[in-house]
Amino acid sequence: MYIALEGIDTAGKSTQIELLKNEYKNNILFIKEPGFTKFGTKIREIIFNDDISKKAELFLFLADRAETIEKFVKPNLHKNILTDRSVISGIAYAMEFFDFNMLVNLNKFATDGIFPEFVIILKLDKETLQYRLSQKNHDNIEKRGLDYLINIQDNMIEVCNRLEIPYLLLDASKNIEEINFRIKKVISEYMDID
């Protein structure tokens, strides 16, 4: 089973992934986008720190996704895979600038049509997002602002709906343990865990 954990910046994905790794490290392959491969680490550095065009950014994300899918997802589709970000957020971020159908086709090409089978979206309200962003330095994506990130969050839901990928929406302002409990419930329901 291939599940994606999605959410905008500061939603708590990384925190949840670390908690899940501690519990399921022997049962789930944990990956992330961008930057899971050596190649992807270089791409991540460029995307988040260099001043590049939106089109260049899109193709770098696609290159990272293609590499991760080819080297880690495809050979392990018979296993449990949990990814921190996926094609869902890739399309959600890019559809602010590019046509949805074109993005779907580019991502189908990059992934050989392998999309997550289920998505968990951590959703933040505007006030919580504003507070969390005020507590950190911003990368190039976060510098686009509060309204941009809230739109991306809505886009993630739209992408799941349009691609007909089942998803669960979780309130990311809840406490870490409650969110973790809900995610583990999904894992036990959808993944074959020994």
UniProtKB/Swiss-Prot annotation:
This is Thymidylate kinase. It catalyses: dTMP + ATP = dTDP + ADP. It comes from Nautilia profundicola (strain ATCC BAA-1463 / DSM 18972 / AmH). GO terms for molecular function: ATP binding; dTMP kinase activity. Its EC number is 2.7.4.9. Pfam families: Thymidylate_kin. GO terms for cellular component: cytosol. It is an enzyme of class 2 (transferase). Belongs to the thymidylate kinase family. Gene3D superfamilies: P-loop containing nucleotide triphosphate hydrolases. Disulfide bonds: none annotated. ATP binds at G7, I8, D9, T10, A11, G12, K13, S14. SUPFAM superfamilies: P-loop containing nucleoside triphosphate hydrolases.
